[in-house]
């Protein structure tokens, strides 16, 4: 049920509200009008669309269905249809006005319009992810609350409305609500800001989406996967993902798998709690998946090795850590737009972590593209030749695997409470968690080397691959969570002498002797920030370290011909509306 301001203003009657309260509504109305005042048909467009698009490498992601049965092909088609509907919701969360413009350009044959449309698709809206979210359409800055909140909403105003009893805190901070103007009351006798649950706000898309999942379940030859799809269909219509997340964790080496839920909070720059919908339809790579089995058995010992007191480590946590190497057949939502993930650790629900653990997914087709088209060329450009050749796809995969494992390690809640770490830290949480996973993951690499699980001679290869990947990530800018995390890490490690720049060659190199101690020190700091939930400490830390030095910016600029990311081109193109 939506929560809202509780004053009544019957339609057709004189509003009985105070002047202050009237101004509150007027403020929202004016803000909304301002946000929507610019016609999507005649926007001011950045003149350098071609240059912006050139920063992305188009990569075909073909799907070989020749080995599938007819039923499997039909099942995949149903899942793609569902993902297309999910993408429509994501656009409304990310940039509703950008969606209008994107749809309006669909039939245009104008090359400029098609370039603009592609850039809108890449970014999921009008704001350039690798230019600190500055607009390339119009001049209005990106609202920190995106489409989750009313235009010009602020954290201070929301907290004030909560304290006055006009909003329920649980609704404001729910991962599955969106702020809108609602008709409220038994007879819809008044209007006002409210927080509507996703399943109500997006029902026009979620209902047919759930039906597609049910039809896909009927076509599946895997009973466990079919059961999961049915439970996930129910979850889409209730916003209760717990039962289906449990079923997802119980899947054993499925041939097909999906990510299909609002999981990540990267888009919410206002509160850092609203989840955006994302989807990936995947087919398992058995040979590569079997190679990861070694890592799974060490997870409990890796957790125990963390530099935290026992009271800040989970007393109970499911240690089930399934790992799947897959190829993406199709992706949608926050897995299609923006930063192209090569791995994920899901679900994010701490209750699932306690009861079951978490699943690590590695998209091989995306990792191969990232390494070949971005990381290796960038390493050759920024690192001395003897270290650049140490950057490898295998070293990058090891780093990525331990990164994802480390998302599931460390504090589950703020020390001494059941308060979520994300709620406590706020918008900076996404960057903090990405940095924690990076650095704790590298600590885990050292532990595995020390205990003979990884050959000693591999350690420096993984350190070099870590730096090569870090250079790739900071090109997204510090407004993006992964970019902010990587910039902070490089700054701190440079301060500790573990990374150093040679001014004569302008190359950046790893000091392999200093790296372990510097990594351990940084891991301790980041884990303590999560354990304490100290928002000011985290904000000040990133304010100090997530700053691009001019000399690094200049070095990156010289490599402008190297793509920043890949732009996947799938065999499927469901319509967006």
Residue locations for each model-derived region?
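Fold-level signature of zinc-dependent metallopeptidase catalytic domains
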Residues: 49-61, 66-78, 169-423, 427-431, ...
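Bacterial N-terminal signal peptides
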Residues: 18-32
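Signal peptide processing junction and immediate N-terminal pro/mature segment
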Residues: 31-39
């Amino acid at each position: 049920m939506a929560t809202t301001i509780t004053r009544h203003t019957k339609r057709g009657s004189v509003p009985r509200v105070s002047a202050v309260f009237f101004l509150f509504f007027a403020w929202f109305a004016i803000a909304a009008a301002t946000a929507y005042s610019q016609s999507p048909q005649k926007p001011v467009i950045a003149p350098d669309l071609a240059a912006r698009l050139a920063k992305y490498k188009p990569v075909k992601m073909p799907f070989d269905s020749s080995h599938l049965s007819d039923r499997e092909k039909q099942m995949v088609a149903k899942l793609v249809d569902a993902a297309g509907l999910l993408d429509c919701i994501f656009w409304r969360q990310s940039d509703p006005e950008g969606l209008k413009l994107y749809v309006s350009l669909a039939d245009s044959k104008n090359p400029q319009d098609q370039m603009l449309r592609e850039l809108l698709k890449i970014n999921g809206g009008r704001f350039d992810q690798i230019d600190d979210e500055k607009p390339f359409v119009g001049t209005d800055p990106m609202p920190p609350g995106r489409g989750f909140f009313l235009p010009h909403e602020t954290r201070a105003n929301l907290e004030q409305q909560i304290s006055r009893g006009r909003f329920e805190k649980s609704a404001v901070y729910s991962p599955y609500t969106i702020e809108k103007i609602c008709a409220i009351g038994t007879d819809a006798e008044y209007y006002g800001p409210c927080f509507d649950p996703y399943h109500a706000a997006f029902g026009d898309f979620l209902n047919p989406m759930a039906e597609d999942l049910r039809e896909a379940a009927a076509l599946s030859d895997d009973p466990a996967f079919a059961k999961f799809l049915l439970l996930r269909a129910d979850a889409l219509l209730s916003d209760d993902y717990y039962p289906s997340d449990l079923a997802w964790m119980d899947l054993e080496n499925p041939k097909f798998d999906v990510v299909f839920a609002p999981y990540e909070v990267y888009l919410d720059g206002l509160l850092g709690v609203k989840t955006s919908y994302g989807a990936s339809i995947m087919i398992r790579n058995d040979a590569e998946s079997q190679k990861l089995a070694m890592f799974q058995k060490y997870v409990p010992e890796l957790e125990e090795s963390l530099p935290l007191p026992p009271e800040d480590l989970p007393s109970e946590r499911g240690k089930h850590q399934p790992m799947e190497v897959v190829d993406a057949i199709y992706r949608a939502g926050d897995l299609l737009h923006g930063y192209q993930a090569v791995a994920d650790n899901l679900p994010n629900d701490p209750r699932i972590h306690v009861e079951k653990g978490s699943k690590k997914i590695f998209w091989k087709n995306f990792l191969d593209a990232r390494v070949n088209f971005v990381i290796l060329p960038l390493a050759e450009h920024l690192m001395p030749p003897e270290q650049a050749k140490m950057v490898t796809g295998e070293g990058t995969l090891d780093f990525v695997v331990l990164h994802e494992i480390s998302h599931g390690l460390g504090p589950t809640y703020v020390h001494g409470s059941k308060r979520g770490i994300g709620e406590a830290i706020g918008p900076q949480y996404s960057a903090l968690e990405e940095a924690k996973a990076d650095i704790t993951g590298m600590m885990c690499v050292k532990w595995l080397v020390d205990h003979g699980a990884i050959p000693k001679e591999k350690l420096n290869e993984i350190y070099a691959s870590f730096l090569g990947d870090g250079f790739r990530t900071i090109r997204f800018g510090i407004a993006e969570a992964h970019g902010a995390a990587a910039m902070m890490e490089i700054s701190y490690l440079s301060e500790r002498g573990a990374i150093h720049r040679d001014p004569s060659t302008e190359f950046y190199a790893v000091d392999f002797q200093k790296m372990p101690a510097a990594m351990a020190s940084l891991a301790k700091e980041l884990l303590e920030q999560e354990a304490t939930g100290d928002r000011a400490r985290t904000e000040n830390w990133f304010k100090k370290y997530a700053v691009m030095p001019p000399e690094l910016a200049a070095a990156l600029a010289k490599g402008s011909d190297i793509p920043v990311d890949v732009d996947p081109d799938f065999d499927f193109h469901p319509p967006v509306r």
